[in-house]
């Protein structure tokens, strides 16, 4: 389980296909603290560490995850939002995030409003209209956010300057 509070940013260093799997190598300051078999959220997607080498580590992404997330669109040099699993007894500053993606959406509009940013997202028109609710929690690229507006096949969230400057 995760909180949706991004711990740090990582940089994609290598992408290697093997059958239907993708081996994703990330460089991050947290790498030396990680252990093989540990789960880390990458843009909100729960992935398991399979190798560690200094400041870099590798995870394996299966085809179903590639089909349902934006992980397959990553390129070398891209920045990813990272979060380690929550610790029992620690404060829950975001909301409970499982790291299992329900669907992807496309950002259709970004505008500034009163010193923050409003992002509008749209998803598949065949989706149920109850995917989001106003003032409900949602995770976008691993970031815990509150839905500002919820409409058929879309929603809006507001991003404060700190989040805008410290996440991808």
Predicted regions and their residues:
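Conserved loop->alpha-helix
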Residues: 1-168
């Amino acid at each position: 389980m995760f909180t949706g509070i991004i711990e740090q940013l990582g940089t994609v260093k290598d992408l290697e296909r093997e059958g239907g799997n993708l081996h994703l190598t990330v460089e991050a300051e947290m790498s030396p603290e990680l252990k093989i078999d540990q789960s880390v959220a990458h843009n909100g997607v729960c992935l398991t560490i399979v190798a560690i080498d200094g400041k870099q580590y590798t995870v394996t992404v299966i085809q179903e995850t590639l089909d349902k997330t934006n992980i397959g669109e990553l390129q070398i040099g891209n920045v990813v939002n990272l979060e380690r699993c929550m610790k029992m007894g620690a404060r829950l500053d975001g909301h409970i995030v499982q790291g299992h993606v329900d669907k992807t959406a496309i950002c259709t509009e970004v505008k500034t409003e009163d010193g923050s940013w409003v992002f509008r997202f749209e998803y598949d028109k065949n989706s149920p209209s109850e995917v989001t609710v106003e003032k409900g929690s949602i995770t976008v690229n691993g970031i815990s956010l509150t839905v500002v507006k919820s409409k058929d096949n879309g929603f809006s969230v507001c991003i404060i300057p700190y989040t805008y400057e410290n996440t991808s």
